[in-house]
Amino acid sequence: MPVAIGALQRHATDHQMEHEVVSGKPLFARAADTGRHVAVVGAGPAGLACAHTLALSGHRVTIFDAHDKPGGLNEYGIAAYKTVDDFAQREVQWLLSIGGIELHARRQLGRDFALTQLREQFDAVFLGIGLGGINALHADGETLAGVLNAVDFIAQLRQSDDLSTLPVGHQVVVIGGGNTAIDAAVQSVKLGARQVTMAYRRGAAQMSATSAERDFARKQGVVLLEWARPLRIVGMLQAGSSDAHASAVQFETTRLDADGQLEGTGETFCIKADVVLKAIGQTLVSDGLDAQLLTLDGARIAVDADGATSLPGVWAGGDCTNHPALDLTVQAVQDGKLAAHAIIRQFARTVAKAG
């Protein structure tokens, strides 16, 4: 049986936070102020880990985040059924309690400030901006009523005080093969959907969702459909409305050709659906970045092993970067820590040269 690393980390963190409340003895103590000031863009796992590590070493940190609440995907991107005790905000407050970290909410890169400004005003910059864009399905009917982004669906659920008041489809089709697709599918079942199908264009072995997540979804009643890609979303006029609403999804069965490339078989079928949730990945939103100077690798920010970008004094980590690992919270946290230590070393070299 695989080791439940996430559950173990959750238990250890909860235990430590509770211990500090009882004992009054914090685990971490901040070093004396160094006079250095770092900007962190994004209050998700990568940004918070970077900020906390920098603050421990005595550097001041200002975090800018576009949302109302800090936490990133831990606050907005994990299904409500997995987060029953407001752990994301408790953990954020625990991290910020070390001191030396100032948080500015509702401050968005590209809208309220640009990377150029941060480079002028701070000694270093860390970008933990995640992936704010949504991949298009490129299928007819994508704009019909009832077709939603799974990420937005989950975020709405997480910020709702009463899940029973939220509308849910009777027949839901989730398109995608990652953990977001699993979350959206299972959450739909728990909200009362009669039939939930999760469709993926390849096989289970190619899904980024873990086998444990897939098994859990099946046990909850989700039907996992492999080797099926959406061709179009069928719309139908509803009584009292002039706008068409999703009523079914037409799929084509797929397979791998002799070269291992995905191809359609020409065989098609339809699944009824009054709600279609797209969970086919996210993209980098480059607004506010120095795109002409900041090197991108494909659709993400290119970084070295320490998280350094092509711009001097700018580091990045988490989902927005091109690291080869999976887009997991634990990887984002590690990215933030590694970048923070690289920034600390850079500051030390600067002091040594000045001396």
Task: Mark where each language-model region is.
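Glycine-rich dinucleotide-binding loop and its adjacent helix/turn
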Residues: 8, 12-32, 93-106, 111, ...
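Rossmann-like dinucleotide-binding cores of NAD(P)H-dependent redox enzymes
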Residues: 63, 67-97, 103-104, 185-232, ...
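Residue-level detector of alpha-helix initiation sites
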Residues: 44-45, 69, 178-180, 321
